[in-house]
Amino acid sequence: MTNILRVKCAVIGDAAIGKTALIQVFLHDRSYFPKNYSMTTGVTLSVGKVNIPDTKDAVELYLYDCSGKEVYLDLVQELWADAPLAIIMFDTCNEPSFQHVSTWASRLSKNSTCGPKIGVLVGMKADLKERRRVSTREGQEMAERIGFHYLESSAKEAEGVQEPFFYLASQWHKTHNEKGELQDDVL
């Protein structure tokens, strides 16, 4: 019998940095990349399942893809308040999006109703090395400051796409396995 943990995960960051693209490529097993940009208005909910290796367990991630536009901020902050997991993203070719990471982390922490988040900071567009403005080291240092794990990804090249989701699912599973709570859901 498979144990399935269900958990809410907020995906946040500035507009037009690749949040939706990363989710879509992950959900379609790296076989689909959205060719045209379509701004997320408010929040889009997607569900992705991660099987935990060497177990019969799986984690269903309820991915709240939150718009990075200020006009939707009040709405999205309410929706991510009770999300135990979070992905904060920035564009490695866009230094202002990186500078805004600490603001996103502060908003996430300030509006949390479920304590500290398990999180990943993801540097997007890692394939565009010639246009890069933020180094891997800078990303790692920022992740350390906000208490998150750091990864880089390219949704377009389907590189590093699964890792953020597998990391969060594994950490969530580990937390619940240690507590003996594998039948509990957190939505």
Question: Which stretches of residues belong to each language-model region?
Answer:
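TRAFAC-class small GTPase G-domain
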Residues: 1-184
